[in-house]
Every structure is written in structure tokens, then in C-alpha cells.
């Protein structure tokens, strides 16, 4: 970590005075400290140099710190820009510089497919039967216009700026979602991020139907490595209706039946210290958020959730077995003196919450109908084991 990447190691053997024993000692002589002269990027046919460099934690002129180099390599792998199947999506090599104590760092990346078009469907305990048509590109460039139709079809357009584009249409019998979002994680290569999304969300719960149509803008900043703060204003039109197939409807649903215009802002802080963003095997992550909303929906909501990952054991050629455990805490209150609307309350149960319970099955119930109507406080502590391939 201090730049001493070469050393002279001498081994010495001495025989003990008694018995068949040999004492082995090593003497280590550190050579000259090395410094970084240049950082070279190779292999990036589509990804811009600046998009790669902003992920690195080492710079020309610094002492050669192998810990920083490993951290930069990890961050590059976690971007998803490069070919994970190659085994080494972002290699780091040393090259002799202009003097004996100078080294050039060569970052050798292998471009991968960052755009994913998915057609699918299935059945989930939380959402019922559903279909899914979505496209996600983690290395999008809204300014990289195609020069021809062939240029577009070969994937040589709209690539290389590290922006994240998501298009999704997911119809279902219990939930339908339409969403478009675009995020720039490093505006002008600064620590600031910006994003915008449009969404239309329909959900058929057991006791009511909800449609949410709106837009969200987010502005964030990376305070330090792996620690982010984000401010997200949102304008949302929420429509609540009773289920036609329900004979008795809870009064909490009837109280909010109709349209509600909600204007809110959420301040969130996220810490992510895991070895891999997509399939973590060690480390932890956590998020804390505060939301304040007004107009027709006057609430203040606080939520904190965290997850810890540990590798229990690893079987060669089978992968690692990882256990994750964590918890969620939330509290919501009305700022108008009225009750918190049923669609802003907390529920537990189902996949991603409490296994063994049906979706939103853990909740206070209406005294007359017995239906789940949500609560103002949420506390969930959960362990979860999962198998990881690598």
C-alpha cells in the first residue's frame, strides 16, 4: 500500500540444538518506492475513457497503492459495462515508466453487452400471474445518435456514456407497471447524479384498487466511496377505488376513495460496501430515507433498512453458500391531524419481506371486515440463505 511493490527476500535455515528441528527465517529488504506515472485505458471500443477513469481510485503522481488498484478494479467490474463471462472484465497490468521508480498502470477492459431486452412472464406470490417486456442499458449515451440504420442495429449508437436507461411494460392480473427512466450517475464526471422517471402503476389489492400515475426527478451526490445522498421530488396522481368483488369494504378504503394529488420529496442516504453489486458474498448495505408530502396526501415517513452478507462455505465448481440477514424499520405519521391514508401505511409478508406469510398478510385488520388495513410502524428482522454461483 505504500508503493513498495518489489522486495528482496532471503531465506535462512539454522538447525536446532536438540532433535530434528530446523529454524527457518526470512529477511525482507524493500526496494525503492514506486509511483504512478500514467494510467492507460485499453480495450474500450465503445465506453468513453472518462467513464472508466471516474471509477478508478488511483491517479498519476501518487504512490503505487495496490489496495487502491484492487478497489478500482472492483468498482469497474461492478459497473456492468464489461464482459463478466470473460473471468477478467477489467484487468490491471504494470508497465515500466520513464524511470526505475515509475510505473504505468494499464487498465485492460473487455467490452460486454450492456443492453438487455427481456421477454418473459411467470407467477409470483406477491404479484400473481404477469408478463414482462423490458429493456435496460447500463452504458447508455443519449447524445450518441446513430449515423445510419445499420449503425443502430449493430449496437454502435447510444453507447458508452455510462447512463442507465430502463423501459418496462409489465402487465398482470394483480399488477401492471409501465415505467421509463434515465439516470446519469456522474453528471459532467462530477460526484453528482441526476435522473428522471415517468411511471404508471396499477395494483389490485385484496381490499382496494390503486392507480398511481406520476413522475420523479432525482439529484444525488457521492459523498465518499460507496456512500450516496439523494434528493427526489415527486408528483403523483393516486386513484383509489373499492373492489367490485368485495361485499364489505373497510371504512379506511371508503375514506380515501377517489383521486389524490400528492407532491412530495424524499431525502435518502445509501451505503453499499459489498464485494459484488449483482451477487454479493460479503459486506453490507443500508439505506435510510425521509419523505415529506403535501397537497392531498399530508404525511411524513421515515424508513431504514440494512442487509449483511456472509459466506458460510464454498464448494469447488458449485460456488458459495451465502447467508444474508438484516432488518427494516419504518414509521409514518399524518401532518394534517387526520389518519394516515391506507395506501401510505406499512405492511409485511411475502417475498422480500417475511417468508411464510402471504403478501401483505402481516398487518392490523379492520375490526368489522377482518381485512388488512396496514399500520403506522414497521419492524422486520429476517435471515435469508441463498446460493451464489461465484
Predicted segments, located by residue:
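C-terminal outer-membrane beta-barrel translocator/porin domains of Gram-negative envelope proteins
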Residues: 98-104, 115-128, 136, 234, ...
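Transmembrane beta-barrel wall of Gram-negative outer-membrane proteins
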Residues: 169-261
Amino acid at each position: 500500500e505504500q508503493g513498495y511493490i518489489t522486495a528482496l527476500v532471503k531465506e535462512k535455515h539454522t538447525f536446532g540444538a536438540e532433535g530434528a528441528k530446523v529454524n527457518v527465517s526470512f529477511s525482507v529488504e524493500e526496494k525503492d518506492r514506486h509511483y504512478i506515472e500514467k494510467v492507460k485505458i485499453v480495450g474500450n471500443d465503445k465506453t468513453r475513457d472518462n467513464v472508466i477513469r471516474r471509477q478508478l481510485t488511483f491517479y498519476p503522481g501518487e504512490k503505487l497503492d495496490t489496495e487502491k488498484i484492487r478497489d478500482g478494479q472492483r468498482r469497474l467490474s461492478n459497473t456492468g459495462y464489461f464482459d463478466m463471462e470473460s473471468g477478467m472484465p477489467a484487468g490491471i497490468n504494470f508497465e515500466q515508466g520513464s524511470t526505475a521508480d515509475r510505473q504505468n498502470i494499464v487498465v485492460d477492459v473487455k467490452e460486454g453487452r450492456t443492453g438487455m431486452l427481456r421477454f418473459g412472464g411467470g407467477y409470483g406470490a406477491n404479484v400473481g400471474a404477469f408478463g414482462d417486456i423490458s429493456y435496460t442499458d447500463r452504458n447508455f449515451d443519449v447524445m450518441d445518435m446513430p449515423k445510419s440504420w445499420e449503425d443502430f442495429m449493430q449496437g454502435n449508437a447510444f453507447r458508452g456514456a455510462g447512463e442507465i436507461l430502463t423501459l418496462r411494460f409489465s402487465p398482470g392480473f394483480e399488477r401492471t407497471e409501465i415505467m421509463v427512466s434515465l439516470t446519469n450517475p456522474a453528471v459532467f464526471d462530477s460526484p453528482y447524479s441526476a435522473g428522471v422517471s415517468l411511471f404508471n402503476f396499477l395494483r389490485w389489492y385484496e381490499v382496494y384498487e390503486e392507480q398511481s400515475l406520476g413522475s420523479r426527478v432525482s439529484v444525488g451526490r457521492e459523498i465518499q466511496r460507496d456512500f450516496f445522498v439523494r434528493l427526489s421530488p415527486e408528483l403523483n396522481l393516486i386513484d383509489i377505488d373499492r373492489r367490485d368483488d368485495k361485499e364489505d369494504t373497510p371504512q379506511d378504503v371508503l375514506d380515501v376513495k377517489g383521486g389524490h394529488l400528492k407532491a412530495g420529496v424524499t431525502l435518502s442516504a445509501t451505503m453499499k460496501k459489498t464485494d459484488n453489486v449483482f451477487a454479493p458474498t460479503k459486506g453490507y448495505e443500508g439505506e435510510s430515507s425521509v419523505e415529506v408530502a403535501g397537497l392531498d396526501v399530508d404525511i411524513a415517513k421515515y424508513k431504514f433498512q440494512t442487509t449483511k452478507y456472509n459466506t458460510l462455505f464454498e464448494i469447488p465448481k458449485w460456488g458459495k453458500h451465502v447467508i444474508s440477514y438484516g432488518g427494516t424499520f419504518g414509521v409514518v405519521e399524518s401532518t394534517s391531524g387526520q389518519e394516515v391514508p391506507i395506501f401510505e401505511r406499512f405492511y409485511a409478508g411475502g417475498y422480500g419481506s417475511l417468508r411464510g406469510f402471504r403478501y401483505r398478510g402481516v398487518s392490523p385488520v379492520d375490526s368489522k371486515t377482518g381485512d388488512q388495513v396496514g399500520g403506522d410502524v414497521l419492524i422486520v428482522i429476517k435471515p435469508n440463505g441463498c446460493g451464489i454461483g461465484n
